[in-house]
Amino acid sequence: DLLAVQSAINEGELSLDELREKFFNEFCKFDKFLTNYFVNRQQRLQRDSLRLSMSGSNWRFPWQADLANAVMLTPQPRRISWWWEAQGNVGKSYMARYLALHCDAVVVTAMKKADMLHLLTKTLSGARCVIFDLTRTTEDGSVSVVYEVLEQLSNGFICSGKYDSTSLFLQPLHLI
């Protein structure tokens, strides 16, 4: 019974392996769906916990307050905000995580263009902004991929040919 599996997952007392043991027949038929449901529930709980631990706006740096305020405004079409520092430990990755948890941001790291576009087509629904959180050591080739994807996002239309090919029309987003 799928409702019994859902209930057991929502109770959160059993591991995924224990759920598979207890609901063997259901997992035989719907393993991918039930595993995704379990993982999504775990992620929701993790996000809620992180959101609580990162609540408040005690910014270490003035630019963080400026950025937090900027993403609450209406996005400007084709505007890309670039935040860069030669040194580390100035709060950029922290800010990316904060915006993902509190302001409906999607955070993207360096990866192949096809993977990046696939990720975006799966996660942009309801997003207010897209943040590219790149390390200082990110290779130039990876950065040029980010430029290409930023161009598509700023045009309001992205295409992904990976797996289940799709294209999306987008409202203006904050691009950071």
Regions found by a protein language model. Name each.
Residues 2-131, 135, 140, 169:
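P-loop NTPase catalytic core of nucleic-acid-dependent motor ATPases
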